[in-house]
Amino acid sequence: MQNQGIKKIVLAYSGGLDTSAIIPWLKENYGGCEVVAFVADIGQERSDLEGVEQKALQSGASECHVVDLREEFIRDYVYPVLQTGALYEGSYLLGTSMARPIIAKAQVELALKVGADAVCHGATGKGNDQVRFETTYTALAPHLKVVAPWREWNLRSREALLDYLKERNIPTTASLEKIYSRDENAWHISTEGGVLESPWNAPNKDCWVWTVDPQEAPDQPEQVTITVEKGCVVAVNGEALSPYKCLETLNVLGAKHGVGRIDIVENRLVGIKSRGCYETPGGTIMVAALRGVEQLVLDRDSFKWREQLGLEMSYVVYDGRWFAPLRRSLQASAEALAEEVNGEVVLQLYKGQVTAIQKKSANSLYSEEFATFGEDEVYDHSHAGGFIRLFSLSSRIRALNEIKNK
């Protein structure tokens, strides 16, 4: 394997089995290069970060940098996507997809700071993440070389990885038994593999690790008031909070009531279908709040355009094109639409369901006077006939032509 002149590599490091093995592998296969470990704190389980620096150094890294990206992740990545209403294939709230560009960006920033020649990730050759990481690298620092061990090495099993570390006397807490593959951040937890590999198998209870089983959730519903400004959640139950703190608060409430579970089969960018169980408790509550205000504020054409924005944005984000001009254009349009998306929504949480039971906005286009079925001074029922005749004119002309040509 050629060194390609690489002297220093910054690795996106998680502390897991794969990236722990990547550190010595890089040093052995890239001419004894220096490996700097980069750990992104995006709200994953705190225990995943305990001792991660020591673990990286024991694996052979020269340095380990743990960077707190939690607030930036929610403020600059999650909230902008929420403004567009993006849902990949109608249900996936893009938890992993949104996290990859901020990780890769911070990794590139560290690489430039320490004078690295290359960046490295631990994504497999079958998944979407390799595309998301490398597209970001290319957009931000095209001169950096990219190393993707899963496309090069012959370590194809957990057993092989464990043996590799054992042979080099590198300690690890990993074991042979790893039933599921999981990704976790402040926004969501995804679970894949194991029993989920067959779409005919119902998820086991251990497929869900964050949210309470809706059937076992509290028997009494709970209400929460969400304040929205410019399409962003800014307060929970009247308390103004930062984006990350808003999400953190709603995650606790949502998980308690079994909110935010989905079990889907999705189309990966690389052409493979995959199944996953996703848990997004706080995010699901936020989406419900935003929809509640949008229903009051956006007119029909604006709402339709926001739906189209969300559809396009879902593919852009899923495909890892965060730093593409198209994403910025979609975002600018969404921000313009969100200017008047201000208001309050009271949501009821009950056994996995989120229901908007009260909503108000100073910019509301809803008028009780117009909405009534009774008589009023501003809407003349007789006007509807002319509108319908014009609205259906093309259908009328087509029908007349068909009769004429019979």
Swiss-Prot record:
One of its GO terms (molecular function) is argininosuccinate synthase activity. GO terms for biological process: argininosuccinate metabolic process; L-arginine biosynthetic process; urea cycle. One of its GO terms (cellular component) is cytoplasm. It is an enzyme of class 6 (ligase). ATP binds at A12, Y13, S14, G15, G16, L17, D18, T19, S20, A40, G122. It comes from the Bacteria. Keywords: Amino-acid biosynthesis, Arginine biosynthesis, ATP-binding, Cytoplasm, Ligase, Nucleotide-binding. Its EC number is 6.3.4.5. It is found in: Cytoplasm. L-citrulline binds at Y92, S97, N128, R132, S181, S190, E266, Y278. It catalyses: L-citrulline + L-aspartate + ATP = 2-(N(omega)-L-arginino)succinate + AMP + diphosphate + H(+). L-aspartate binds at T124, N128, D129. The keyword ATP-binding applies. Pathway: Amino-acid biosynthesis; L-arginine biosynthesis; L-arginine from L-ornithine and carbamoyl phosphate: step 2/3. Homotetramer. NCBIfam families: argG (TIGR00032), PRK00509.1 (NF001770). Belongs to the argininosuccinate synthase family. Type 1 subfamily. This is Argininosuccinate synthase. It comes from Serratia proteamaculans (strain 568). The lineage of its organism: Bacteria, Pseudomonadati, Pseudomonadota, Gammaproteobacteria, Enterobacterales.
